[in-house]
């Protein structure tokens, strides 16, 4: 999973 940290995908 992508470590974006804003979509809740963290």
Curated annotation (Swiss-Prot):
Subcellular location(s) per record: Secreted
UniProt keyword terms in alphabetical order: Amidation, Neuropeptide, Secreted
GO biological process: one example: neuropeptide signaling pathway
Positions of modified residues (Arginine amide): 10
InterPro entries xref list: Lem_TRP (IPR013206)
Predominant localisation class: secreted
Cellular component terms (Gene Ontology): extracellular region
One Pfam family per UniProt: Lem_TRP
Cited function: Myoactive peptide. Stimulates the contraction of the oviduct and foregut.
Entry protein name: Locustatachykinin-4
Provenance organism: Locusta migratoria (Migratory locust)
């Amino acid at each position: 999973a992508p470590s974006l940290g804003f979509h809740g995908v963290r």
